[in-house]
Amino acid sequence: MLETDVVDRIRAIFLHEQPYVTINEAARMLGWSGSEMIRAIRDGEIELTTTCSGERFDIRELAEKAIDLWTLQVIEKALGREASLILPPGVRTQKLELRLPAYQVAALRVLAGDASESVDTMLERMFLELADNERERLSGVIPDLAEAIAWPRQPITPQAS
């Protein structure tokens, strides 16, 4: 069961109707303190955009950061029915069951632990990198690949399924 505040933050980001949010709104949506947000801006982890209303965050920038904070499975679950409207078909999760030698499972657990992430998160990131590296070859056989790899940098707007 997902914590209510995590669900609320994810939904606030992915279902946000405006293209930009203030620094304070962004910090609240990500669950960060003001000092964490200032550090992230200073370190280039997240970039501000200058708008006619001043410096703001593009909601897509927050969506990218959300993907770093939560797995796609968590995001999809938090979005509930709206997931099919927000997540492109190639991004929606599917269950994959596999069997690996014990040493590979142990290695995955150690490496994920070293990176302070779950095995699912680590594998999700590794497969994204693999698909991106093999994009040219895979694009011809996986119709939604380019859109899936580009997401969420493309506009986050509800789509008909």
PLM-predicted stretches and their roles:
Residues I41, C52, E61, A66, ...:
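DNA major-groove recognition helix of helix-turn-helix
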Residues A115-D144:
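Short, basic amphipathic alpha-helical segments that act as recognition/interaction helices
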Residues I23-G31, I38, Q94-L108:
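Short amphipathic alpha-helix starts
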Residues R60-T93:
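A short, Lys/Arg-enriched interface patch at domain edges and termini
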Residues M29, E47-T49, P101-T121, R125:
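Surface-exposed, Lys/Arg-rich phosphate-binding patches that contact polyanionic backbones
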Residues M29-R56:
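Major-groove DNA-recognition helix of helix-turn-helix-type DNA-binding domains
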Residues N133-S161:
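Short, charged, intrinsically disordered terminal tails
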Residues V6-E36:
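Polyanion-binding surface elements
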